[in-house]
Amino acid sequence: MLTLSRFNIESGLRRSLPIEDGFMKFVDLDRCYSVSRVSVSNDKELVLYTLHLSAYTSDGTIATEQLTMLINDMQAEYEKGNYCIAGGDFNKDLLVDSGKIFGIDGADYTWAQPVDPTLFDGTNLSMVAPFNEEKPIPSCRNADGPYNDKQFVLTVDGFIVSDNVTVSGSDVYDLGFKYSDHNPVYMTFKLNG
């Protein structure tokens, strides 16, 4: 994971995420997110989270625990008056039903379930799924073989923002999965106040 900024990053921290204890521990990578702090002009901080959450968990419990930990950390920073943005690979179907949107049945691929929207209840945070309704582009393809246009595709890469951040746009760059099993995503935003 890498966080780059043209603004000075004051500090960085790696937070370990929960992982499974059973056999899946040996096939899933140790998961984490990084926390980078950028000072802004109103004596607050822009707190950036770069993440890569688990995909292949036995029952989805660990993935929910990981997302809950991130949401709780972001909410605590928001309550201090800071601006919060998380971005990365959630390994969740951020569009809820990517199979329908992209016209490729994902019934055989159960690893990317939708995000449970109730995880955000009582918070000042919201999910941003990069999407252009006129020309939808997936952010990820299933990596079970070389890329082909019949392969299962979906959007698992996106953002979470605090409500003091206004998002003006978010989409996926269509690179045709030339460099990896992911296409890059972007978000344009402004800090309020």
List the predicted regions and their residue ranges.
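Structured beta-strand-rich core segments of catalytic domains in phosphoester-bond hydrolases
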Residues: 1-45, 51-53
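Low-complexity, intrinsically disordered Gly/Pro/Thr-rich segments
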Residues: 165-176
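Surface polyanion/phosphate-binding segment centered on an Asp-His-Pro turn
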Residues: 85-87, 182-193
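Conserved beta strand-loop-helix elements of the APE1-like EEP
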Residues: 1-12, 39, 121, 151-166, ...
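Short hydrophobic/aromatic beta-strand or adjacent loop that forms the aromatic wall/cage
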Residues: 1, 29-35, 153-159, 181-186
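Metal-dependent phosphoesterases centered on the DNase I-like endonuclease/exonuclease/phosphatase
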Residues: 47, 57-164
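Active-site metal-binding loops of divalent metal-dependent hydrolases
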Residues: 51-53, 88-90, 183
